[in-house]
Amino acid sequence: CAAVHGDRLLLQPAEGAPLPAFDARSYSRPKDFVPARAADRITIDADAVVGDLCIRRVAAGDRFAPFGMPKGTKLVSDYLTDRHRSVLEKQAATVVCDERGIVWLVGETVDRRVAVHRSTQTILDIRLLPPDREA
């Protein structure tokens, strides 16, 4: 599921699973840091990630705390419904998780607990690899 290549971590699903591959790098937060604002890339607080990361499809009952939602959690299915996603898009939704739960609803938003804050010292930059770059 994960392989180290130099200073990079390549996250990949189990063999045979139709999931995308990701590239992840961590680095010290620069003074002029600006969070990534792309559907295929996130920058999060590396120290807020607990344990290993894994990639999987959304499961029934999955909950997370979308960045920007001040309190509580929301079902991923409700979040996607609120954004007018089709049933097919919901079924294909992918998440990156750590041991505590969802870190990133891919293509949508990060979980509030891993968002970069003023006190963040180490950034974890995760990006979706294009299909032609998957290993």
Task: Name every feature range the model reports, one short phrase each.
Residues 1-135:
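AMP-forming adenylation/ATP pyrophosphatase catalytic core
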